[in-house]
Amino acid sequence: VSRDSKSAGGAFEVLIVDDDPGDVLLIEEALAERRLHHRLHTAGDGVLALEFLRDSAQPRPDLILLDLNMPRMNGRELLGEVKADPALRAIPVVVLSTSAVTEDVTDSYGLRANAYVTKPVDFDDFVATVQHIDDFYLGVVRLPRSPGSHTA
């Protein structure tokens, strides 16, 4: 989905899956600075995210920003569920984690993450990183609608 194809249809739906309220707030602020029409949804763990994704009353996200280390169902488990589900697998999933461990990167790509980005520690770098992700996935890339999409 590119901005062109969404401009007539409305908001870009972004699901942020992260158990750290501070990181969620930073992501929200970074996207708010864009002054574009985003609708942000949050889930504090993989269980809540999967409930959101499988709820036909909820909009289908155009992008999922996913932390790895969370309670109940971690990011790896959620990523595996999303990419195994024909109705969800076309949604781009960007792992946004504090971990720079090679095994985490390799495992995430093995589970079919679309990208793996290490969260910068510096505030300005964090904001810029989120905005680069937004530019690429919601401004440049054209994606097919997921089978069984909740929206037209």
Please give the residue ranges for each predicted region.
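Conserved acidic segment of CheY-like receiver
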Residues: A11-A32, I64
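Receiver (REC) domain active-site loop signature in two-component systems and cognate sites
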Residues: M70
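Active-site residues of response regulator receiver
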Residues: D67, S97
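C-terminal output helix
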Residues: L48, V121-D134, V141-P147
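Acidic, metal-coordinating helix/loop segments flanking the phosphotransfer/catalytic sites
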Residues: E28, T42-L63
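Short, glycine/charged-rich "phosphate-handling" switch motifs in NTP-dependent
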Residues: N114
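His-Asp phosphorelay/catalytic-motif detector in bacterial-type signaling
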Residues: G10-A11, L36-H37, P59-L63, A87-P92
